[in-house]
Each structure stands twice: as structure tokens, then as C-alpha cells.
Amino acid sequence: MIAIGSDHAGVKQRQQIIDYLKEKGEQVCDLGCYSEDSVDYPMFAEAVCEKVQNGQADWGILVCGTGIGMSLAANKCHGIRAALVSDAYSAQMAKEHNNANIITLGGRTTGRELAWEMVKAFMGASFLHGIHEPRVEALTNA
């Protein structure tokens, strides 16, 4: 299960990602928001983080205007490792090296095709453990 949420600036891209994921046979938990009226992004970040924290979702996606606000909000939640990704390589590395459990993207800065490439890269990657494990453990225990 993939939890996904956005603020008003990420509504369109969130829906496009949901459609893409469902097309690929993925189960999606859509946590809003559902309109382009201005909302506060931290509440949507928290909703996605809770799903990941309690195991109801394997990982999550958050979308706001730039991805920065959602990344900051998500990383305040215990056990969450949210990575703002800008291309397929950063999405892959977020999983392989940092064991990210949430990726954040910018609805105003990322086109549809690039968003799909980033999601696909993250989904196809696995944590590499090894030298990365103590680093991730240090983040988790901070």
C-alpha cells in the first residue's frame, strides 16, 4: 500500500500519480487534499506519515508546490525518512542509500513524466544496507 497526500499546489500531480500507480496495479491510500483551495500542508504530511509509521502503508508520496514544505513536515515525524527528489537518480538513491520511506515532489516544479520516472525509480529500488545501515540507524535514532 502506498499512502499519498498533497496540499492545494499538488492536487493535480497527486491525482496523476494515483492514476499511474493504479494503472500499474498498486494499492493506493489517497489522503487528500481534494481541492485547489489553500490548505496547510503539515496536516497532510502528518496523515501520510501516520500510515507509514503504523504499517498501514509501505511507503508514501507527498506533493506540495516545491516538495520542500512537505519534506520538512514529514521529517519531524519519528521514524520517517522523507527525501525531496528532483530526478530518477535522486529517487533511486533515496531508497538505496538512505532507505527513505517517503518521497516528496514539487507539483509546481515537476512535470508529469518526470514525476512518474521518479516514482518508478523509487519503487524499483531497494535499500542496499552495508555501509549505509549505520548511517540510516543514526538518523532513525536521532
Where are these regions (language model features)?
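Short helix-loop-beta junction
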Residues: 20-27
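Short hydrophobic/aromatic-enriched beta-strand-loop microsegments
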Residues: 27, 80-87
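Short Gly/Thr/Asp-enriched flexible loops that form oxyanion-binding sites at enzyme active sites
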Residues: 69-80, 89
